[in-house]
Amino acid sequence: MILFVSATDTGVGKTYISTILVEYLKNKGINVDYIKPIETGVDEKPEDAYKVSSILGKPWQESVIYIFKKPMSPYACSLDEEVDIDVDRIIKTIKEREQKASVLIVEGAGGIAVPIKVKPLIDYAYLIKSLHALPLVVARAYLGTLNHSFLTYFYLKSKDIKPLGFVLNGFDYEEPSQYSNAYILQDMIEEHINIWRLDKNPDENQRINLAENIWKSIANF
């Protein structure tokens, strides 16, 4: 199966959540693998792919397909560096990796609607749909997340994609909206959906509990 870690925006913690899940599944003895097909903003090495692949003891080169220098959308980078992103190659590579693992975690770049190609638009929702993947959406815990999270949910729904759930990441106990965001988001969506919360600096038990709850929800999805 493919668990696709996407997000409402960039910089909300997709890689961090991916590391938590990979470490948890590996420690459970589950054959888990990871790939981030496109990473942008790369200086010397792709930091996201490197962080997660190092947990698996694999070279980062096995965990990324396209690397771009500037911190822009994949499509903008492809124009800037004059590289044609082969989406069929990405899908083929991911499907091949899926066959070799019990769980393949795929990490997107930026949010769910970030363009990979245009005319026609190919974004991360397109990849999720094409791969029959199960999307997990990472979002900020604080002010602004209701708008971003609901729009992300609504966009996925318009593509007939139901997310496994949302992780409201970075709860810091100071900003007041964080205490109500989870249940208000649930009310806005108007159907049951998993919404988890993770502290800004979670301890090991919190990280394990999050991964365990996500893993259990997959079995019941």
From Swiss-Prot:
Question: Which residues participate in Mg(2+) binding?
Answer: 15, 48, 107
Q: Where does ATP bind?
A: 11-16, 48, 107-110
Domain of life assignment: Bacteria
Spell out the reaction equation it catalyses: (7R,8S)-7,8-diammoniononanoate + CO2 + ATP = (4R,5S)-dethiobiotin + ADP + phosphate + 3 H(+)
Q: A single Gene Ontology molecular function, please?
A: magnesium ion binding
Q: Which GO terms describe its biological process?
A: biotin biosynthetic process
For the ligand (substrate), the binding residues are: 40
Keywords of the record: ATP-binding, Biotin biosynthesis, Cytoplasm, Ligase, Magnesium, Metal-binding, Nucleotide-binding
GO cellular component, alphabetical, reads: cytosol
Its Enzyme Commission number(s) read 6.3.3.3
Q: Which Pfam families match?
A: AAA_26
Give the pathway listed in the UniProt entry for this protein.
Cofactor biosynthesis; biotin biosynthesis; biotin from 7,8-diaminononanoate: step 1/2
Subcellular location, record wording: Cytoplasm
Listed as disulfide-bonded, the cysteine pairs are: none
**NCBIfam families reported for this sequence:** bioD
Q: What does this protein do?
A: Catalyzes a mechanistically unusual reaction, the ATP-dependent insertion of CO2 between the N7 and N8 nitrogen atoms of 7,8-diaminopelargonic acid (DAPA, also called 7,8-diammoniononanoate) to form a ureido ring.
Q: Which family does it belong to?
A: Belongs to the dethiobiotin synthetase family.
Put simply, this protein is called ATP-dependent dethiobiotin synthetase BioD
Q: Per UniProt, what is the name of the gene that codes for the protein in this document?
A: bioD
